[in-house]
């Protein structure tokens, strides 16, 4: 069985974070493992508290996984400090980790893509320009998610200087807590199973 590691925060409501990641990876037929960056008190209406893991403990979590069950893919979610990011980067480099969702591909929604690109996005052309800028700046593929009122939930994958649209249909449902975690975990699961990035996104 293929394996996938999620490095992210814990969601006490189970709708996002580590809990959503593990559910998604399991549903996609891979063995899920986790390294928790923070405990959060949250639900569908917001976050009321965060208790961050220490850098030393996060390093121990990652070591425990890589020295026993080497993951076929890694998904990185919520990381709340630069110090923890440094630990993750150092450990993944030292273990020569493969298929890292957030290093190989980032999955920003529209507000996140605006921050990463420094551009205002109001239409599909804006998504393309922002995705291109992010890809060039961070040297990775970008899956820009269009569900924030820009279109009918069409997503854009930008890689190697080219864009590919994945057409979606907006679902009329306010329960969207954790959808980004679920999508990135599904992509990581498919990468772990050997699919290329386009097929993993589709």
Cite the ranges covered by each PLM segment.
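Conserved phosphate/ATP/ADP-binding segment of small-molecule kinases
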Residues: 95, 103-163, 198
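Short glycine-enriched, charge-decorated loop/helix-capping segments at active-site entrances
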Residues: 46-52, 117-122, 172
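Glycine- and other small-residue-rich loops at beta-strand/loop junctions that grip anionic moieties
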Residues: 10, 76-77, 145, 176
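Glycine-rich beta-alpha junction loops
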Residues: 39-40, 78-80, 112, 147-150, ...
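Conserved N-terminal subdomain of the carbohydrate kinase-like
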Residues: 2-6, 22-101
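Short pre-catalytic strand/loop immediately N-terminal to key active-site residues, enriched for Gly-Thr
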Residues: 7-13, 163-178
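Short, small-residue alpha-helix embedded
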Residues: 19, 114-115, 173-197, 201
């Amino acid at each position: 069985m293929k394996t996938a590691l999620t490095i992210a925060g814990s969601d006490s409501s189970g709708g996002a974070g580590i809990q959503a990641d593990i559910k998604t990876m399991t549903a996609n037929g891979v063995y899920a493992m986790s390294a928790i960056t923070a405990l959060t008190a949250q639900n569908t209406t917001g976050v009321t508290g965060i208790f961050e893991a220490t850098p030393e403990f996060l390093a121990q979590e990652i070591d425990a996984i890589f020295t026993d069950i080497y993951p076929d893919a890694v998904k990185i979610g919520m990381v709340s400090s630069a110090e923890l990011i440094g630990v993750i980067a150092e450990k993944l480099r030292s273990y020569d980790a493969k298929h890292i969702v957030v290093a190989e591909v980032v999955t920003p929604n529209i507000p996140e893509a605006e921050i990463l690109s420094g551009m205002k996005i109001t239409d599909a052309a804006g998504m393309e320009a922002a995705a291109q800028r992010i890809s060039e700046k961070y040297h990775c593929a970008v899956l820009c998610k269009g569900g924030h009122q820009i279109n009918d939930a069409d997503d854009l994958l930008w890689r190697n200087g080219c864009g590919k649209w994945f057409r979606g249909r907006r679902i009329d449902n306010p329960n969207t807590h954790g959808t980004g975690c679920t999508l990135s975990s599904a992509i990581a699961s498919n990468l772990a199973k050997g699919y290329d990035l386009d097929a993993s996104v589709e």
